[in-house]
Amino acid sequence: MSIFITLIAALIVFSAVIAIHEFGHFTVAKLCGIQVNEFSIGMGPALWKKIYKGTQYSLRALPVGGYVALEGEESPESQQAEAARDEREAEDENPVPPEQRTGIPLNEAPVWQRVLVMVAGAFMNFVLGFVVLVILVAAQEGAITSKTIYSIENDALCGQTGLQAGDEIVAVNGRRCFVANDILYELVRTEAYRARFTVKRDGQKVELPDVQFDTWQDEDGQTHMTLGFTVYGIKKTPLNVLKEAWNSTLYYGRIAFISLADLVRGRESINNLSGPVGIVTAIGQAASYGWQDLLELLALITIKLGVFNLLPFPALDGGKVVFLIIEGVTGHAVPEKLQGTLTIAAFALLFGLMLFATYNDIIRLVTGVM
């Protein structure tokens, strides 16, 4: 796969994910009557800009994402801050003249509206993921894969330890299975090649506490698991496509959350973190396999970004929501100085993690170990 195609594919993916996120903030801010000073596609010098209904719309030279500038996003608390803000406006940092502004500053909007603005970006990431998955499910060949067992191989260990043909797999190890991939994901996480299944059998839920699976070893001595059963296909109707896409969105969202939880709990090594270099490499590989693999990776990235942004961590949208909830409960905003200190510390930590992940990416590229 050429470097040019990899870069183009990466630009498309990153731009789509970031632009849709910022569009979410922009749309809800507009609906809530909050002043949006600028909505930009791309970064860097402006190639084109126009003020329309109180907002400057701009197209910038670097086709990487975009941003939304909201009036009052950093609310002043002191006379010094107010003076600095007046100085910025005097220098025309705000692209919209005062007489053309149509909304109120963000910090003057009700708390609930500010919360909606903060979560709207992540929400649109989930929407993008869902739309992409609808396209993928509709375009796939054959039927939709179900979670209902069609047949079990002769003498398969899973059949001897509880599973039967006709069982609909509801959960594995206590985690609900939204799609067939959930079953595989949980079994891969099961190091002992055995798991607790919940199935629906003859209309009743049945607990199977110790379903075991056959294993085999390759010539390198690596142990692999044999599933030992096949499942029914589901007819591809518009409703079933939408249901499968919705359940797949939940599946990807849970993968993102579990991955983060595993990292915090130490189950997943921090050395496995991927940074920008690793993500671009993965995008290039997906693009080389075809448009469907690229779209699937786009869905995974945008849903992961949505989950990550909602974490209650300063510098992320979820952290801002926590500050707003505190303000709503106590009636007093968290001091701007404290917010700023926590946000700077959080940015420093995230930047450090990104550098560490980028270092890991480069080492993997050099050594060929992915």
Predicted regions, residues:
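Juxtamembrane boundary at the C-terminal end of a transmembrane helix
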Residues: 356-370
